[in-house]
Amino acid sequence: MAAKIKKGDTVIMIAGKDKGTKGEVLKVIPDESRVVVRGVNMVKRHQKPSQTDPGGLKSFEAPVHVSNVAIADPRDGKAVRVGFKIDQHGRKTRFAKRSGESIDV
């Protein structure tokens, strides 16, 4: 299946405790169908001290399932479904189904 969400995309949380929050995709985990989004699903973990880091309680972004996020429309920033089409150069590109705006730049 083609990747509808890629690293660097702006997404909106559509379910869960962070519903409505926008963020940038930091990491995609395709084997688990999960993504890590900046500032979303924050968890606290105890970090062991190292030579460069004092350790203690640290906040990290935990992965969320891709079904709980939607791509933000480049035109108005609302949640939108993603489609694929072949451009004039023969490349497969993503576009927002609601506005027709291209997501890939």
Curated annotation (Swiss-Prot):
The keyword RNA-binding applies. Pfam families: KOW, ribosomal_L24. SMART domains: KOW. One of its GO terms (biological process) is translation. Gene3D superfamilies: 2.30.30.30. GO terms for cellular component: ribonucleoprotein complex; ribosome. SUPFAM superfamilies: Translation proteins SH3-like domain (SSF50104). CDD domains: KOW_RPL26 (cd06089). GO terms for molecular function: rRNA binding; structural constituent of ribosome. It comes from the Bacteria. The keyword rRNA-binding applies. Keywords: Ribonucleoprotein, Ribosomal protein, RNA-binding, rRNA-binding. One of two assembly initiator proteins, it binds directly to the 5'-end of the 23S rRNA, where it nucleates assembly of the 50S subunit. One of the proteins that surrounds the polypeptide exit tunnel on the outside of the subunit. Part of the 50S ribosomal subunit. NCBIfam families: rplX_bact. This is Large ribosomal subunit protein uL24. It comes from Hyphomonas neptunium (strain ATCC 15444). The gene is rplX.
